[in-house]
């Protein structure tokens, strides 16, 4: 008599869970307009957390520390003192 011992194995490997594998969505922070670029009133100039760059002439600051232009003009990123930076918008004078 022929005795057959058949064993069946899983054809898919069991997958364990992991504690990794997720990340928060990026916030797209940083400069939105370049130095020397013409900007319009209301344009967002710089998105930031905290005041990495401070508002200068004709630049406002939003509730989330976003810098925006108050008037039409040319954007300038300037150094103030040793370690402070600010963004200013200077209106263009038409002659």
UniProtKB/Swiss-Prot annotation:
Biological process per Gene Ontology, one example term: translation
Pfam family of the protein (one): Ribosomal_L27
CC per GO annotation: cytosolic large ribosomal subunit
InterPro entries: Ribosomal_bL27, Ribosomal_bL27_CS
GO molecular function: structural constituent of ribosome
PTM entry text: The N-terminus is cleaved by ribosomal processing cysteine protease Prp.
Propeptide part(s) removed at maturation, as residue ranges: 1-9
Keywords assigned by UniProt, alphabetized: Ribonucleoprotein, Ribosomal protein
Family: Belongs to the bacterial ribosomal protein bL27 family.
Database matches in NCBIfam families: L27
Protein name, entry field: Large ribosomal subunit protein bL27
Species of origin: Agathobacter rectalis (strain ATCC 33656 / DSM 3377 / JCM 17463 / KCTC 5835 / VPI 0990) (Eubacterium rectale)
């Amino acid at each position: 008599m022929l005795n057959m011992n058949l064993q069946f194995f899983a054809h898919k490997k069991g997958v364990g869970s992991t504690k990794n594998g997720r990340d928060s969505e990026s916030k797209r922070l940083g400069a939105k307009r370049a130095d020397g670029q013409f900007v319009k009133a209301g344009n967002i100039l710089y998105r930031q957390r905290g005041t990495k760059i401070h508002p200068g002439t004709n630049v406002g600051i939003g509730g989330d520390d976003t810098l925006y232009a108050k008037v039409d003009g040319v954007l300038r990123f300037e150094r103030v003192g040793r370690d402070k930076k600010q963004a200013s918008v200077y209106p263009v004078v038409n002659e």
